[in-house]
Amino acid sequence: MSDNFAAVGIALVVAIAINLIMMLMPKLLAPKKPVPEKLTPYEGGNQTIGRTWLGFKSNYFLYALVFTAFDVETVFLFPWALSFRQLGTFAFIEMFVFIVILLVGFWYAWKEGALEWM
């Protein structure tokens, strides 16, 4: 059993070492003198006037959050549905409560406008 852990540990150390090497190589091999052309903005080469960082409202995370909740529900529902006959009434009640909690959360998100676009 400890041989399996040793193999996982060695693989982890090798993966970390490869990542560190790949992150350090550009810093070691890149030219050190900054060229003025590389410091100019790309878009047309024009110097910007005023504030250049414009914030925008992104609601994708709300959709991702709701999707993740229902994706987790699917992960729990699939094995439960496959072994439904062996589990009995108690498992049915537990899964029913789980689905009700998720539906209440979905209803609340809908009511609060979390699913409205912009």
Curated annotation (Swiss-Prot):
Transmembrane intervals: 5-25, 61-81, 90-110
Bilayer topology term: Multi-pass membrane protein
Protein's cellular compartments: Cell membrane
Entry's Gene Ontology molecular function annotations: NADH dehydrogenase (ubiquinone) activity; NADH:ubiquinone reductase (non-electrogenic) activity; quinone binding
EC class (word): translocase
Keywords: Cell membrane, Membrane, NAD, Quinone, Translocase, Transmembrane, Transmembrane helix, Transport
EC number(s) per entry: 7.1.1.-
Reactions that this protein is recorded to catalyse: a quinone + NADH + 5 H(+)(in) = a quinol + NAD(+) + 4 H(+)(out)
UniProt family annotation: Belongs to the complex I subunit 3 family.
Function of the protein: NDH-1 shuttles electrons from NADH, via FMN and iron-sulfur (Fe-S) centers, to quinones in the respiratory chain. The immediate electron acceptor for the enzyme in this species is believed to be a menaquinone. Couples the redox reaction to proton translocation (for every two electrons transferred, four hydrogen ions are translocated across the cytoplasmic membrane), and thus conserves the redox energy in a proton gradient.
The name this protein goes by in its record: NADH-quinone oxidoreductase subunit A
Species of origin: Desulfitobacterium hafniense (strain Y51)
Lineage of producing organism: Bacteria, Bacillati, Bacillota, Clostridia, Eubacteriales
